[in-house]
């Protein structure tokens, strides 16, 4: 029986036990394998007779701060638009990112920085871990309100591994360039989440339809997330690019692309809106598509005009997606995309990957000069042509879509295990299922919810 004492006890213990197990296992693995790198270790750094001003901390940490704020504040508040799910949006973002950054340090460390029997970490490890956490949070947006915290932690456990493998294949085996993660972060996270949502499809989700909308103050809080993301996105795309002209160019291209996507979003929102009025959903999300679409190409010689054109296109495509494609996605394809990650991350991510194919194919020694080595080292060394680089960029997109689709399917099957607690159809998008909500009174909509109600569950 759904409401039996044994099930209630299991639900009470599920999250604490899983958190303790995952943190304990991670701590043991850190103790065995993780060590400071030579720029962090006291003895190794001073043995090299370096100046403290040469430490990468001073070059990379400002970007890390911005990326960190995007992950924990930007993503968290962007998802508080649901009128009864603000605690869960911010709280589960906090939980997922805190676990994902630890687990990804291990996974990425084994793949990228494992030597002499240890993983060596520094500030770049922190940035890479936050990038991985960002992909997990993108996937979270697709299933927001329909999953429990234990399910989300297991999703992160699987997704981080697949993210790390996909990133390793693209960046190290194929030599793909993807500085801002149009493919490795946005496309992967979006389609992993969308396939996951398809596997977890709820035919009776209409029972919670009254909670799916926003109210005035929840949309206002969500705009805080939008502004944080918009301001810091140039740092996100440029955080790990080559110091100097490459990093400068990446930030500049992202800056202009975001500005153009914002104007494109306002224009299309008014054009397709009822009586020419703006839709806050479009402004909160599609205005950010400019940061996604130049993720791959922002370190390349995209040109300021190219950045503006790409951003404007991404903003318009994303807005049209929210207006027309999201309803089709649910009615025809049975994908219930809560946050519209397909419109903000999926389509702009694919467009960004294709833009990277185009710009890589146009790369020449004349255009880049000595800077070709930092952007396309294999072309500079004569190991491949610009056309070959472009073809591998395109192949990298297909590899990412494959990893995301297979991973999302496996994740959906994992999250459907019967012993995992998830909210019934009539209690989705409701904080009271998982949180003590202060100030609640006796009206029917806000009474303590009964988990024993018989509904279809994910």
From Swiss-Prot:
Gene Ontology biological-process annotations: ammonium homeostasis; ammonium transmembrane transport
Keyword Magnesium: no
Cellular component GO terms held in the UniProt record: basolateral plasma membrane; spectrin-associated cytoskeleton
UniProt topology in membrane: Multi-pass membrane protein
Annotated SUPFAM superfamilies: Ammonium transporter
UniProt keyword list: Ammonia transport, Cell membrane, Glycoprotein, Membrane, Transmembrane, Transmembrane helix, Transport
Role description: Ammonium transporter involved in the maintenance of acid-base homeostasis. Transports ammonium and its related derivative methylammonium across the basolateral plasma membrane of epithelial cells likely contributing to renal transepithelial ammonia transport and ammonia metabolism. May transport either NH4(+) or NH3 ammonia species predominantly mediating an electrogenic NH4(+) transport. May act as a CO2 channel providing for renal acid secretion.
Subunit structure as annotated in this protein's UniProt entry: Interacts (via C-terminus) with ANK2 and ANK3; required for targeting to the basolateral membrane.
Protein name: Ammonium transporter Rh type B
Gene name of this polypeptide: RHBG
